Amino acid sequence: MDFQSDLTREISPQRKLGRGKIEIKRIENTTNRQVTFCKRRNGLLKKAYELSVLCDAEVALVVFSNRGRLYEYANNSVKATIERYKKACSDSSNTGSVSEANAQYYQQEASKLRAQIGNLMNQNRNMMGEALAGMKLKELKNLEQRIEKGISKIRSKKNELLFAEIEYMQKREVDLHNNNQYLRAKIAETERAQHQHQQMNLMPGSSSNYHELVPPPQQFDTRNYLQVNGLQTNNHYPRQDQPPIQLV
């Protein structure tokens, strides 16, 4: 117990004092400055090594003392890391410059388009006879010439379409007339055929009148009469007209 109390009394003042804050400024004493440089340099190199191992980072550390002596550390290569740094800085600067250039270009193009839209709107109003107060005599004459030229083109196009429509209607009329003549001819031909058929039916020798005028043939009883053809003689003998033989 006495040993622990004595140890506590010895350690407690150190805990109370702790490590004081060091003012960050140039050390005037050359010896102290050199000693501090060596300590801090070794600690910095150690931290760089730990960072590269623990975090798998590419680290390059370059330190020059006040006497010009070089101290360096790199887990890969100082030169390769510096080249990579230069390339990254160049890419970022180029990206920024390209973005700025694009923004300026689009702004200029937008301004040009707005100006063109404004001019076209003014010209449209002038063509409609509006916003003529600020125009000079020469501008009004030019506007009049443009309007007359436009009207001439419009009339020419209108007449072209009108003539094409008239030509189409004339052609359509001819086609309808031809179709009408063809139908009339077919109707007349049909009427003539019907009239001829009616006349043939009314003639005495027509088949219909023949059936009406000629009585039907007489019916014979086959039990009492024989056909003449069955009793006809041969062609080598003279033919004799005989009445049909009646069987009793």
From Swiss-Prot:
BP GO annotations: positive regulation of transcription by RNA polymerase II; regulation of transcription by RNA polymerase II
Domain MADS-box, chain residue ranges per copy: 19-73
Cited CDD domains: MADS_MEF2_like
Record's keyword terms, sorted: Activator, DNA-binding, Nucleus, Transcription, Transcription regulation
Gene Ontology MF annotations: DNA-binding transcription factor activity, RNA polymerase II-specific; protein dimerization activity; RNA polymerase II cis-regulatory region sequence-specific DNA binding
Start and end residues of each K-box domain: 103-193
GO cellular component: a single term: nucleus
Locations listed in the record: Nucleus
Keyword Nucleus: yes
Principal location class: nucleus
Pfam families in UniProt: K-box, SRF-TF
Function: Probable transcription factor involved in regulating genes that determines stamen and carpel development in wild-type flowers.
Protein name from the UniProt record: Floral homeotic protein AGAMOUS
Organism: Solanum lycopersicum
Gene: AG1
